Amino acid sequence: NKWVLLLAHSYGITTTIDQMLFNGITQINELDAKVAQSRNQSIKLVAQAKKLQNGTVASFLLPQFVDHADQLYFVKNEYNGVVIESGFADKQFFYGKGAGSFPTASAVLSDIAALRYGYRYEYKKLTQQVPSTLSGDFHLRIYISFEDLANIPKEEFASIEEWHSGNERSYLIGTIPLKSILHKDWWKTNNTSLVLMPDNIIENTALTELKKMSLSLAGL
């Protein structure tokens, strides 16, 4: 719900959580943590919104591998981190407590003070002439770990770049269209876990180049 409010602020998009791609971290297991450690990464729950080349917005809330060089890597416990990027201001990082008695009390006190002066909350992006819309036309680069390959729809992947097989648990890394995981349960059941890769949004133009590269590596 917090992410829905931020979408309204940043892009003027009105939506509900049931229309979004989201999941928590309860399915993350020991193998996933070991893979992250071997790559000098950590797994964080990250909400993202990015304007695509066609003007629509890709948005989701999922566990993600975060590189050690990324500022979000060091965000832990009750702290939150926000990264904002614009055409003129480049990247900006905000860091602070998102839970606890004092941060909550401070926010409530701020709202009470605002009411005294007749302040009304505004969503200025909702009044823009051409509101942004959520996109369903992009691919995601994901890591999937599982116990039984039969539960994974391999045919849905546009490409699979890594495959590791183990005695009890295996994983793969590949690129899959949003429609293959949005409102689908295969990646949430049968002890399956999904984690986004750091560079995870693949637009159609980039996907075409990815397929060309795959064919080239295959000698076709």
PLM-predicted stretches and their roles:
Residues 1-74, 79-81:
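Substrate-binding/catalytic subdomain of NAD(P)-dependent oxidoreductase enzymes
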Residues 13-17, 30, 46, 53, ...:
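Generic marker of "main functional regions" within proteins
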Residues 33-43, 91-99, 103, 161-168:
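Short secondary-structure transition/capping segments
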